[in-house]
């Protein structure tokens, strides 16, 4: 499958429905509840706004897209700590967070990183890791190093980038460990001129609260945006699920484990363009799902991708850090961003979803009488994974071909 992948926040949605005919996970643990104050919840909502804009910016007609908006948001948040006023304003405006101070953004990211580390659902594994590497002998300002340690739990390491293969091996080793071996080679173009690599890694592995029965997985046709028909494996189930139906699309909510996380699948009605519904979904925030008995047919799929983000971020308004060598003087003098890159992985099957991403910034210098609906996901669709208590988007994307 030919793909485009991006990553920064995680998209999963939850419903509390359960089917007694399906075996449940034993001892699911206490449901994660990230308690945000009013301001932090507002920042979270702005982060989801950024996620939607990012998907629209990358939604090429005939290519699959995978995003982790949270991963990119955290990486840019780290970079913002070293930006001068003009560069900082570009970063936070692009993130839809211009109304908040650096201290408020750092506090919000610290809260998320700490809460995610405390997740105790045995059916869900979730991790956010940060790290930084600077050229040996390069002087990094103390305030920046302190903020990275305090708010982002990010060690600042020294690395000999002139020994390119050894430098790549160290950073790839970190990525492999942080993503449970789902991303092993970042393919970063390091050389002796590299001064900085700032990195975030996110990893999610969630088991459906009701797994799909493999006996019901059947071969079917997925109708791609490119006009081609793809033969693929479809998972099939009929069960009570949270569901939204409009004149333009159908949306279903699938939960993981103890419902701390959920996934949404949004399917445009036949004849409706996938890009058109992205804006409609954004306008429909706060929509109320109802419980239906859903006859669901959902394709198994996997995405592996690498995306260079420079032009996308520049088109969204971040320019100074790429062109002004005084823009990051809060980190060090003379530093420029040469590359923003995301590597990603996503796999969905009968048991659940495994997803991971790395964002790197390289620098030089329920109802018993539920109505029945059918949702056959055999044409392009949008998906997302959310943390339930905040609604924060971890991963999101679109599938237009198999």
Where do the PLM segments sit?
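Sec-dependent bacterial lipoprotein signal peptides
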Residues: 1-15
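Non-catalytic, conformational "gating/processing" segments within enzyme and secreted inhibitor domains
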Residues: 62, 102-269, 287, 291-369
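Non-catalytic interaction/Regulatory regions outside core domains
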Residues: 4, 87, 331-334, 340-358, ...
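Short Gly/aromatic-enriched secondary-structure transition segments
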Residues: 91-95, 212-219, 276-284
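Detector for small/aliphatic-rich hydrophobic stretches
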Residues: 5-6, 17-161, 399
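Extended hydrophobic
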Residues: 198, 250-266, 370-402
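Short alpha-helical patches at coil-to-helix transitions and adjacent helical residues
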Residues: 3, 69-73, 192-196, 390
């Amino acid at each position: 499958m030919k793909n485009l992948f991006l990553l920064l926040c995680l998209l999963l949605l939850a419903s509390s429905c359960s089917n007694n005919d399906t075996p449940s996970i034993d001892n699911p643990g206490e449901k994660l509840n990230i308690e945000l104050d009013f301001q932090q919840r507002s920042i979270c909502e702005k982060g989801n706004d950024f996620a939607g804009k990012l998907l629209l910016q990358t939604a090429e007609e005939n290519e699959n897209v995978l995003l982790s908006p949270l991963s990119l948001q955290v990486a840019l948040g780290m970079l913002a700590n070293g930006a001068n006023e003009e560069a900082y304003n570009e970063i936070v405006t692009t993130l839809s967070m211009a109304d908040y101070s650096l201290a408020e953004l750092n506090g919000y990211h610290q809260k998320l990183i700490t809460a995610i580390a405390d997740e105790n659902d045995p059916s869900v594994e979730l991790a956010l890791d940060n790290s930084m590497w600077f050229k040996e002998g390069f002087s990094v300002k103390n305030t920046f190093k302190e903020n990275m340690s305090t708010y982002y739990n990010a060690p600042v390491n020294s690395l000999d980038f002139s020994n390119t293969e050894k430098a790549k091996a160290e950073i790839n080793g970190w990525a492999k460990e942080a993503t449970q071996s789902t991303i092993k080679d970042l393919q970063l173009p390091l050389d002796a001129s590299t001064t900085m690599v700032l990195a975030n890694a996110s990893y999610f592995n969630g088991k459906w609260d009701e797994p799909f029965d493999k006996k019901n997985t059947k071969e079917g046709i997925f109708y791609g945006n490119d006009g081609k028909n793809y033969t693929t494996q479809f998972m099939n189930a009929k069960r009570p699920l949270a569901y939204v139906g409009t004149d333009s699309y159908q949306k279903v909510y699938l939960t993981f484990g103890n419902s701390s996380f959920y996934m949404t699948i949004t399917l445009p009605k036949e004849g409706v363009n996938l890009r058109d519904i992205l804006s409609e979904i954004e306008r429909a925030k706060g929509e109320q799902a109802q419980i239906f008995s859903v006859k669901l047919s959902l394709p198994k799929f996997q995405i592996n991708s690498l995306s260079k983000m420079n032009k996308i971020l520049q088109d969204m308004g971040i320019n100074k850090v790429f062109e002004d060598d005084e823009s990051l003087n809060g980190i060090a003098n003379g530093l420029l961003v040469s590359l923003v890159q995301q590597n990603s992985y996503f796999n969905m099957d009968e048991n659940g979803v495994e997803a991971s991403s790395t964002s790197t910034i390289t620098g030089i210098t329920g109802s018993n009488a539920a109505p029945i609906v059918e949702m056959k996901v055999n044409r392009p669709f949008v998906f997302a994974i959310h943390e339930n208590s905040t609604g924060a988007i971890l991963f999101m994307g679109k599938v237009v071909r198999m």
